[in-house]
């Protein structure tokens, strides 16, 4: 038993009671509203809300009010509609989203797309300062401009540089003084004024690829190498002689190796005089060895050793033969040219040496 009274048995009874009290108060409120409505004086229609008044002005700055008007519903005309909407209210309302396929500038006036001039002011041109100077000079009929004229050309043709003049003007001035492609020309006596003229070096016109100023400038080393003529190989030979020394054999061999690949070396015969010298050397050696072996060999081993020691003269003669002619450059680099010109000569030399060593170091059968 509670002191505040007995609680209802149904748990939803309290909610039902509250809902009933709310409905009673709500009905009383509407009765009061219905009684007060006829007593109000008829107010004049507000400007901009009537059908005729709202359609006369121009398009509204709001995008959701720029579309065509909605078809008025029957309940907005005051006929059989609800009493809570007075006659004429919302008759001139527009729909929120216009039935357009896409949104344009008229749909969003606050997001106006800039024109081409505005875009050029915001975007930096894709040209270097040297390219801007070259364009200014080439567009002039006299092919020469002063510093102030170059400034004027850049500012007039590229609106991006109108914002801050101090930065890019310093860069142009530095490019004129540091770049070898721009030459300073003094004023004539009959041309009064301030400042010298600037012109393009004729050798640097290829740097911009005939007006394609967006292309990067070629390296200076490439332009210097392109200026070499056919006598460049001769200059390299002289430099090699000075650095290595013409008296030393290493310097001569290095010079011969560096001269390989030139047109002069390609036109010469590959195995001309060198083959003749080596064959003559081998012929002399082979004839001497044959004469030595054909002579009656002594019967004692000590005597044979003496003959072998005498044959050193022929070996020294063979070793004294030139390996390669100093006037002919061979295509093999880093390796010496053999004395024997062909495989047959090398095999013959091997057989002769083998027979020489065996016949003179060991005794023949039947000889004591």
UniProtKB/Swiss-Prot annotation:
Q: Which InterPro entries match?
A: Fork_head_dom (IPR001766), FOX_domain-containing (IPR050211), TF_fork_head_CS_1 (IPR018122), TF_fork_head_CS_2 (IPR030456), WH-like_DNA-bd_sf (IPR036388), WH_DNA-bd_sf (IPR036390)
**Where is this chain's protein located in or outside the cell?**
Nucleus
Which stretches are tagged as biased composition: Polar residues? 255-264
* Origin species: Xenopus tropicalis (Western clawed frog)
Quote a single Gene Ontology cellular component term.
nucleus
SUPFAM superfamilies named in the record: Winged helix' DNA-binding domain
The record's SMART domains line, in alphabetical order, gives:
FH (SM00339)
Q: What does this protein do?
A: Possible transcriptional activator.
The entry's DNA-binding region: 124-218
Where along the sequence do coiled-coil regions lie?
A: none
| UniProt-recorded name of the protein | Forkhead box protein I2
